[in-house]
From Swiss-Prot:
GO MF, one annotated term: DNA-binding transcription factor activity
Name of encoding gene: ERF5
Residue stretches of biased makeup (Low complexity): 35-48
Domain of life: Eukaryota
GO biological process: defense response; ethylene-activated signaling pathway; response to auxin; response to cold
Keyword Transcription regulation included in the entry's annotation: yes
Protein name as it appears in the record: Ethylene-responsive transcription factor 5
Organism from which the protein derives: Arabidopsis thaliana
DNA-binding region: 155-213
Keyword Nucleus listed: yes
InterPro entries for this protein: AP2/ERF_dom (IPR001471), AP2/ERF_dom_sf (IPR036955), DNA-bd_dom_sf (IPR016177), ERF_plant (IPR044808)
Keywords in alphabetical order: Activator, DNA-binding, Ethylene signaling pathway, Nucleus, Plant defense, Transcription, Transcription regulation
Amino acid sequence: MATPNEVSALWFIEKHLLDEASPVATDPWMKHESSSATESSSDSSSIIFGSSSSSFAPIDFSESVCKPEIIDLDTPRSMEFLSIPFEFDSEVSVSDFDFKPSNQNQNQFEPELKSQIRKPPLKISLPAKTEWIQFAAENTKPEVTKPVSEEEKKHYRGVRQRPWGKFAAEIRDPNKRGSRVWLGTFDTAIEAARAYDEAAFRLRGSKAILNFPLEVGKWKPRADEGEKKRKRDDDEKVTVVEKVLKTEQSVDVNGGETFPFVTSNLTELCDWDLTGFLNFPLLSPLSPHPPFGYSQLTVV
């Protein structure tokens, strides 16, 4: 049930909109409609006020009616507005709000629409390894790679390779504060590793870490290896050529004994007689011996 204040407000709005002074009332059709509306509103108001007369006092609507007339109708602009007739078109223009973009605009907004649409995550698998094929000239020969033996690849304990290709073996002696003990130089890394294993087993026993633990007790004696090395060193030495001393026989001028001019052995020199050595002919131009081709000279 509406309150009296709400009913009075509705009645005032209807009177203001459908009154003869309003522009809407100029249209005869609207006037007829307004008259019918006023009659219905008056009937409804009479019914409402008739039913509520017992409980409510009569309401004075003079104040509510006069206030909007003072605000809206006293100004000259409102009078001019009332004097000008208005015509309202009953036809309703229906505008098409469906936006149909052109092909050019559609192409421009396509990336934005696609970016807004969230795509499901993709599972990216790693591509297969690709091998590059290098095309070379027909005359070029492929490089021949020398196969590296397992012996050169593997590093043995206690073995070092020299720059010239030999392999040296050494071990640290725990009894001498970890000082290095030289074990020798070998042609192959396996020989050097076996020499290290033998020395490590002698120093540490069963606690030694060996290169070939299954060969314990099967090592060859190194005496033979020492003899081979010594023989190889002897072959590398330069042999000294001994000079053979020639012997000459002295000429016996006076019919005396002949003595060797130069001896080939020291033993013959020791067996000489001193008297024979003193009688050795002089090799001087003053010598009286004609076989040398010089005549005897006289000193004045």
